[in-house]
From Swiss-Prot:
Family under the similarity heading: Belongs to the RapZ-like family.
An annotated Gene Ontology molecular function: ATP binding
Keyword Transport: no
Positions of ATP binding: 8-15
Keyword Amino-acid biosynthesis: no
Provenance organism: Pseudoalteromonas atlantica (strain T6c / ATCC BAA-1087)
Disulfide pairings: none
Listed name of the protein: Nucleotide-binding protein Patl_0571
Amino acid sequence: MKLIIISGRSGSGKSIVLRSLEDLGYYCVDNIPVNLLPTLTHTVADEYDQVAVSIDVRNLPKDPNELVEILDYLPSTWEMTILYLDASDDVLIKRFSETRRLHPLSKQNKSLSGAIQAESQLLAPIAERADLYIDTDQLSIHQLAELVRERILGKKSSRLVLVFESFGFKHGIPKDADYVFDARFLPNPHWEPDLKPLTGLDSPVEIFLGSQPIVTKFIWQIQNLISTWLPHLERNNRSYVTIAIGCTGGQHRSVYVVEMLAKTFSTSHPDVQIRHRELNR
């Protein structure tokens, strides 16, 4: 049985995620008080094998220790995943301004900016327990729904999921990355006229980068690092590890390196996922 707990700051996309899971067959409950969570799970345990609930700042206990006790009281037979959504303060302010919605904490005589910052502190206990963190800054509604399907429903087992993500430094480092590697020192296909319009998924770019000893060594050293520490990460009960590879624009070098790493680890690891952030823009 699976239980997905969705939380995050207001405006980060919790409702979108919940609707996506409902479309995929999950029994969904929106904004349930945390102290009712054990009752809900015990009630539906015999009727549903996939349940998703969203929890916002209004439904958290004041004592962080109480939250831990409630989560620990949930049925041990359930496979629980805590998904935490977030976005930058500027993006959240923009979203509230566009929708003209009131922030849940605005009734406490706080400015919108102050309410957003206060919410971050109040949600810290559940954010710290999150198995999966998703930054929705640059995601459309459809991209967020697809990412959730990929990250959660794409899991093939209870083992740790390796996520390899390419990105461009000029667009910012992914906030959900556990490890970040800089590939900007590698030979750049951008300066080759025939390769410039292509991506790291195209054969000519693969041949160009694959023939460079420095590229091969870079990939091998990342493989060695991840392989060395992967058993320790698994023993730590991690659900996801995101390895982000960045180049300038996220089009050639980082894409190629991610593809090579994913290809290598997929032969020995049951759950490997790929995301090319800039190619999906």
